[in-house]
Amino acid sequence: MEERQTCDLAGIWRFEIDKEDRGFAEHWEKRRLTQTITLPGCLQAQGYGDAISEDTPWVQSLYDALWYQRGEYAYAQENGTKVPFLSQPPRHYTGKAWYQKTIFVPEKSDGFVGRLTLENTKWKTTLWIDGECKGLSLIHISEP
C-alpha cells in the first residue's frame, strides 16, 4: 500500500489584491507578492478591502434604503457604518486576489502526485507552480 503524505499549508502566505485585474498581464505568478495574509481565513477579516459604507453595493440593495437613519442603528454613527445583519464583514472586496506559498517537495518524489484543496474560493482558481500554469479549476480541486 502506498504511503500518503500530507502537507498542512495553514499559516502566513504572501498575498496581493488585484483590484485593477493586472496580475495576469503583468505576470504576478513570476514575482514575489508583497503583502501577507493568514490562511485559513478571509481577506476582509484581516483588514483587506474597502470600508463598509452606505455606498457598498450590497448595502445599497437593502429593502429599507434609509435603514442607517433609523433609531436602532444610531449607535453605529460614531464608529462607522453598521448594517442590519447578524454577521457583518469588517471590509468589502469581491475581486481577484493572488496568494503565494513556497513549499519544498523532496527530490525522492518519483511518481509524486500533488493535490491542492482550497476552501471557500470564489468563481475560479488558477494554480501556478514555479511560474508555470498547472491548471484552472471551477470546482476548486486541482491535481498538477
Where are these regions (language model features)?
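Short, Gly/Pro- and small/polar-rich lid/capping loops
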Residues: 1
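Short Gly/aromatic-enriched secondary-structure transition segments
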Residues: 24-40
